[in-house]
Amino acid sequence: MSMSDPIADMLTRIRNAQVVQKTSVAMPSSKVKIAIANVLKDEGYIEDFAVTEAAGKAELKIGLKYYAGRPVIERLERVSRPGLRIYKGKDDIPNVMNGLGVAIVSTPKGVMTDRKARATGVGGEVICYVA
């Protein structure tokens, strides 16, 4: 049976791995997951990520980041989902925790943070909130 929401699965794997203080987490890879991991790395929420080939399938391995024994990511919440897509225009993109967190947005110009989407002047699908 195929997975109905692979992005939610990715976020859940990251949350679960951080609860048990894992240094890294592996999952099936896709272009969108790589783009999300790239945004998380650019914003400093994860150490690094790598795509490897395992048994003919691409696998995304994310290195998790901790500060003083606590996970850097405190909140990782899926917003738009297959049953209810959430789209926002450039003026309506939400501020996460008054700018302390980021919203990851899928735009026509690629996956980016809420700040970059506002600066670029594009809206799109709000994938998740990270704080």
Curated annotation (Swiss-Prot):
Part of the 30S ribosomal subunit. Contacts proteins S5 and S12. Keywords: Ribonucleoprotein, Ribosomal protein, RNA-binding, rRNA-binding. It comes from Janthinobacterium sp. (strain Marseille). The keyword Methyltransferase does not apply. This is Small ribosomal subunit protein uS8. InterPro entries: Ribosomal_uS8 (IPR000630), Ribosomal_uS8_CS (IPR047863), Ribosomal_uS8_sf (IPR035987). One of its GO terms (biological process) is translation. One of its GO terms (molecular function) is structural constituent of ribosome. The keyword Ribonucleoprotein applies. GO terms for cellular component: ribonucleoprotein complex; ribosome. The gene is rpsH. One of the primary rRNA binding proteins, it binds directly to 16S rRNA central domain where it helps coordinate assembly of the platform of the 30S subunit. Belongs to the universal ribosomal protein uS8 family.
